[in-house]
Amino acid sequence: MSVPFDPASYDRQLEEKTVRLRELLAPFDAPEPQVFDSPREHYRLRAEFRLWREDQKRYYAMFAPGDNRTPILLEGLPIASERINALMPVLRERWEASPTLNHKLFQVDFLTTLAGDAMITMCYHRPLDAEWQAAAEQLAAELNVSLIGRSKGQKLIIGQDYVTEKLDVAGRTFSYRQPEGAFTQPNGTVNGKMLNWAFDALGERQDDLLELYCGNGNFTLPLATRVRKVLATEISKTSVNAALSNLDDNGVDNVTLVRLSAEELTEALNEVRPFRRLHGVDLKSYDFGSVFVDPPRAGMDPDTCELTRRFERILYISCNPETLAANIAQLHDTHRVERCALFDQFPYTHHMESGVLLVRR
């Protein structure tokens, strides 16, 4: 659910979110949450637009939730990065001037980074040929972007099919490949604040870390520098490949990444059954003191929640405070909330990103 874009009301909206998080965590005697705000505009590093034809022209369009028939036609998007806003009108001029680029184009996606990279994905209801490739190569060079052309069963890459982000955590710069089509944190500034909070909350450890739902290694890279070694899990092939590249690019060599779900890992740790994907991984060699979880909106399922109970410290990043509270309630008899935080990843919506550190009683 969204609320109107109104920078003048930002502080009030953030306070309302803070009150809501405070209320949800009150039953667990949680400390006052640290609050990390967002830039008021140009904070979103990615944007996806359908194209809407009107008066023989195509316009960028978005739709209100639940209404895919009434387009909101856009010249720019104030919540999107300055780079996206600069690219939008130029790209539209170019496709309007080029029948090859324009023909059966129905969607345009932008992905940018704080480090200055940009990638545009153009989606078509037709096969893409050599003529399109030549026009796209010229366009990519002119705009200084990577360009992806997509149609059914086809993906043409001009440049690279990822962008590179650089984020500073505790004085060290980490480089992240963010692949086209994979999940990335949309608010880069707040993501940097989350990484630094998690790094500080975990602290310097002499034991090992288990990470569930590691994605492209967003948290894995900085947290790996705080522990002896890390076992990280992820099920998306695209994210696994990106995470492996990111570990290599940053010289992080104490992480083992396995393609298992949280449920499968629970079975492996409980020795319910062996997994071929764990071949060569000696689970008994790990001395896990902490677990890091960043689950989907549904939160942790009961079995995964029980798995985390066996760890002294649970570092939990949540995109849904209601399911976070439900998971804490399940763990509250053995773990207390030592730290909590609100990260305003999504200004002008009711969505909240939050974090807690749970420590065994």
Swiss-Prot record:
Q: Which residue spans adopt a coiled-coil conformation according to this UniProt entry?
A: none
What GO biological process terms does the UniProt entry carry, in alphabetical order?
A: tRNA methylation
The membrane-spanning stretches of this chain are none
Q: Which UniProt keywords apply?
A: Methyltransferase, S-adenosyl-L-methionine, Transferase, tRNA processing
Which enzyme type, at the first EC level?
transferase
Which residues take part in binding S-adenosyl-L-methionine?
Q185, Y213, N218, E234, D294
- InterPro entries assigned: MeTrfase_TrmA_AS, MeTrfase_TrmA_CS, SAM-dependent_MTases_sf, TrmA_MeTrfase, U5_MeTrfase_fam
Taken from the record, one Pfam family name reads tRNA_U5-meth_tr
Q: Name one GO molecular function term.
A: rRNA binding
Reactions catalysed, semicolon-separated, are: uridine(54) in tRNA + S-adenosyl-L-methionine = 5-methyluridine(54) in tRNA + S-adenosyl-L-homocysteine + H(+); uridine(341) in tmRNA + S-adenosyl-L-methionine = 5-methyluridine(341) in tmRNA + S-adenosyl-L-homocysteine + H(+)
Which E.C. number(s) belong to this protein?
Answer: 2.1.1.-, 2.1.1.35
Which residues does UniProt mark as catalytic? C319, E353
What do the Gene Ontology cellular component annotations say? cytosol
Q: What does this protein do?
A: Dual-specificity methyltransferase that catalyzes the formation of 5-methyluridine at position 54 (m5U54) in all tRNAs, and that of position 341 (m5U341) in tmRNA (transfer-mRNA).
Name of the protein described by the UniProt record: tRNA/tmRNA (uracil-C(5))-methyltransferase
Organism name: Pseudomonas savastanoi pv. phaseolicola (strain 1448A / Race 6)
